[in-house]
Amino acid sequence: MYVLKRLELRNIMSHFNTSIDFREGFTAIVGRNGAGKSTILEAILFSITPHQAPRRSSMISENSSRGEIYLALQSSEGRLLELRNKLIRRGGGTNTEAAIITLEGRRIASKPTGYKEEIHKILGLRGLPNPASYIEKAIIISQGGLQTLAEILSEPKELRDLLDAALGYALLKQAISNIGDVVLGVSPDGSPVKLGSKSITRLQSGYMTLRNEVLGVDREIREASKRLEELEREREELERRARDLESEAKALQSEIGKLETMEEMLVNVTSMIRSERSKLDTINTRLRYAESKISSIDDLEKRRAELRAKASLAHEVAELARLQSRLDKLGRDLEMIRDAVEKLEVSRRLKEIESARREAENRLLEARSSIKEEQRRYTLLDYRVTRGRSIVTNIRRVLSECRSKDLCGSEKPESVLERLDAVINDLESKARALDQEASALEAEARRLVQALSMLEESGGSARCPVCGAELPPGRAEAIARHYRHEAERLRKAAKEKAAEAEKARAEASRLQDKRRRIELLLSRLNQLEEGLRELGFQTPEDLAKAEQKLRMLRERLEELRKLENSLEEKVRNLSREEVALREAKTRALEVLQRLGIKEEEAREKLKTLSSESKKLERMLVSKAEDLATRLGITAYRSLDDLLEKAREALEGVDKELSAIERRLEEARRLKEEAAKLKWEAEQVMKRLEELEAEEKKLRKEVSRKSEIEARLKEVQNTLAELDDRISRIDREMGELQTRIREMKSRKASGEEALKLYLPAAASRRIMEEIGEIAYRRLLAVLEDEMNDILSRFNLDVAGVEIREKAAREIEVKAIGGNGAYRPLEAVSGGERTVLALSFVLALNKAVGGKLGFLALDEPTANLDEDRRRSLVEVLRGISVEGLVRQLVVVTHHEDVRDYADTICLVTRTQQGSRVECTY
């Protein structure tokens, strides 16, 4: 039998991270409405049904996309069964992402598809038609479930339906009905053979009818076989004639094949003639083209001479480019010398810049020294002020907490402490006095109980417990009632005194807590004031003065930092300018050194190079104009443009010369090709004459083909007629064979049905008798188990009787203490609830499942105090008597805690539901 071991919930409704360890015995899950108690049972139900829960579509917590339920169960032998379901929110509902079953550390299911079958097999529920419904009615009972079950016990038809579901009787009835619907075979007329719901006489009549049909089919098979043999003989004669005609057709087809080969040869010869004629035309075309090209050789040689004259100007273009390159280099040297001379002029301000930079750096060092000193003073004062502010804030917070309404209020803390000491002493004295009074009342009650025992044990000769005199029976009973009533009153008074004492001690404990809080606040206040004095502040006014001085230091620091920034910027600018001047002078000297010019000769060298550049430029312009005239270039933008156009013109001349050379070479080649083409044309003409003679011969042979084809067609038509006749015979034979096979199949099916008919009828009768026996056995077991459970409680209902009425309805009668029957409607509501509980326990034992726990959701809801106390006492008795290994009750009534072995308190906070268990 499996009981609950551990439950873990991750993001399940209001439970974000909940773990509960269950133990055997009576477990009470207590909490206010909406705290999340019922979610615990819903999660257990979801794990073992499987995946059935009242609010499955919203089981995952809000603002969460995934959730997880882990349930561990332990068997009587100590085997651990672990069920883990991982949920995911998808669309508008909740889907099971993974469903894992682990037994003794071995995984036996990991997908939702295999989860259901495995959990039913492990928990012994595979024989039930609807295990989920059974668990919800008899294992995990929702709010109002016991009352509903008590009402079902009074309704014979509904009770029958419930027992049918638990026993699986509906499946047995369906199995019996299925035997009647099973097709045992097919009769020879094609109708299915079934038992249905026929009587024995009708079943025997049906058997004889089926046997006669089988014999009739056997006669039809013999007649069809005789006709099939006649058709086979006729078919053999037709096939012999067809073979003779096929031999003649093959000879004709062979002759036609030879003629078709000749036709192909004729086509090939014709194609070769066309090919040779096309080849001759191509040769003539190429010959005419070659002759036209040969005629243009003289014009090409004249044009080649003109182009060679222009190509000789390439040397002058190269000379002009060289002069331009020399002029460009001279211009670059002039530019470099001119730039170096200008930079040397500017670098004369270098000493002035160096002096200004050193002065700015000295001022910057002085400013940084002042900033460092002021920063040190500011940091020390800022630390003292910050610590002082924090201490003053804490002092105010402590004073505010101390002056709160539930501590000191407007009184001084010392006065409140003195008053609390007095009140606590009074409450403790009062509690001791009340304890003494309660003990005295308990002792008096025990004395009365002892006297009552003496009266009851004395039997017929009762004596007065005070004087020992013999009492008449009526007087003895009156005294016993008086003692019993007085003892009950004294016990009640003792409990009230004990409750008052406990209340006084609780109040004293609360006041002691309040006193300790005030003492802690006073100690904290003294520590804070001492810390303020250690910082050098005797009063808050000293702190305000320090804050004003701190602001002045901050303003002074800001002014010094602004001065520092301006001086740093000035130093950077002067340094950059100094570096730039030094670099300019260095670069100028490097340029002059690279050109081999001394610093003092730079100006004179600049004038000399300028004069040389102008002279070279005039020479270059003269040569460029002459070249443009000879090449025919009329317009150009610059010397570079002229050189580019001259190079393009010379490239065009070179290309045209190359093309002319190629054309001249081609013309010489064409002269040789023309002679070759004339010879090829003569050879093609000879081959044409030979092919035309062969074509004439082939056409004469091919003309015989039409006569042979006519005879072949005649033979083929005769063969087609024979094939058609053979096909008709084959179809008729096929139909006969099919019909014979069908009749044999019908005969075999009928014979098979005859073999199964009588055994199936006997099986149906046996199953009907087994169902009735099992049902009567279940009712007897339920009655015995319920009476055994009820005998353990002191109830007005001593037992029950369960009987089957007409129309298969179940009636439950209550048996009073005097042995008289009582209808369930006359039984009190509390006793009907106990009957429902005993029915659930008896049904679980009769079904034989492997779940050893019972869970009830709010069973005490809508009950008055007396009925609630009675029900809880019964639940406690069920646990103590061992009628169920583990009883879990979810309720919002706090008084249930006094009866439970394990108490789990469920509370709801902003962070979700919390569960704290006391064992």
Swiss-Prot record:
Q: Which residues form a coiled coil?
A: 208-268, 315-379, 414-458, 486-515, 541-595, 635-749
Q: Which UniProt keywords apply?
A: ATP-binding, Coiled coil, DNA damage, DNA repair, Hydrolase, Metal-binding, Nucleotide-binding, Zinc
Q: How is the cofactor bound?
A: Binds 1 zinc ion per homodimer.
Cofactor(s) of this protein: Zn(2+)
Q: Which residues bind ATP?
A: 33-39, 143
Which positions in this protein are listed as binding Zn(2+)? 464, 467
Give the matching SUPFAM superfamilies. Answer: P-loop containing nucleoside triphosphate hydrolases, Rad50 coiled-coil Zn hook
* Gene3D superfamilies in alphabetical order: Helix hairpin bin (1.10.287.510), P-loop containing nucleotide triphosphate hydrolases (3.40.50.300)
Domain Zinc-hook, residue spans:
417-516
Family classification: Belongs to the SMC family. RAD50 subfamily.
Protein task: Part of the Rad50/Mre11 complex, which is involved in the early steps of DNA double-strand break (DSB) repair. The complex may facilitate opening of the processed DNA ends to aid in the recruitment of HerA and NurA. Rad50 controls the balance between DNA end bridging and DNA resection via ATP-dependent structural rearrangements of the Rad50/Mre11 complex.
Quaternary structure, from the entry:
Homodimer. Forms a heterotetramer composed of two Mre11 subunits and two Rad50 subunits.
Q: Which PANTHER family match?
A: ABC TRANSPORTER ABCH.3
Q: Name the chain's protein.
A: DNA double-strand break repair Rad50 ATPase
- The organism named in the record is Aeropyrum pernix (strain ATCC 700893 / DSM 11879 / JCM 9820 / NBRC 100138 / K1)
